[in-house]
Amino acid sequence: MGRLVAIAIGSTAVVALGVIALASRRPKSAPPKRVALIGDSYAVGLGPELAKLIPDFKYEGHVGTSTSAWANHTAACGQCGDWLTAFKPNTVLVSLGVNDGSAPSIANYQRIVQGLNGIGADVVWIEPPAAVNTQSRNTIASLGGLRGRVTGTRAPLSPDGLHPQQYGPWAREIAAAIST
């Protein structure tokens, strides 16, 4: 009988050690990501939807703004992301380019990326919806310094031919892309 008790106690100890070993192998949860979004009318539409999906999130968007406005800090872009330094985002989503016309300036894109990298943020550029014909897509594809790009949504466009009918599906695509 004493031997059975010893075996039972020994087995319990081994199982307990195994549980402790498994628990210590689990990855520690990363601190919540701070995510920001800056941009044009797409940011205006995406911001409220992404705020539902990302706990530590802030955004600024201004209809009709271009990379030139943001890169050169013009009045058109309001604060132009001045709040980003205090917010200290890990990742900044940039939704700009569709308003740049037929000859986007790579220098404006690079200035934005360098400025955001300079505050310690990874930059993920959000391309315009796939059905929107824009020269900015090639410029975005050629950028260095990005953590990544989110290709344009294939969601149906509104009658204006530029904006999605609904921003929720696009926001979910973006949130999934940056969580990997």
Predicted segment positions?
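Short amphipathic alpha-helical segments and helix-helix/interface helices
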Residues: L50-A51, Q110-Q114, R137-G144
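Active-site segments of SGNH/GDSL-like serine hydrolases
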Residues: L93-G101, V113-T139, R154
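Conserved SGNH/GDSL esterase-like catalytic core that processes O-acyl groups on lipids
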Residues: P31-N108, A131-T134
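Single-pass alpha-helical membrane anchors
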Residues: G2-R25
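Catalytic His-Asp segment of secreted/periplasmic serine-dependent ester chemistry enzymes
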Residues: P129-T180
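Helix C-cap/helix->beta junction micro-motif
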Residues: A43, I119-G120, L146-R147
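Sec-exported extracytoplasmic/periplasmic mature domains
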Residues: A51, P55, T85-K88, G97, ...
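Hydrophobic anchor at the start of a short beta-strand
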Residues: V35, F57, A121-V123, G148
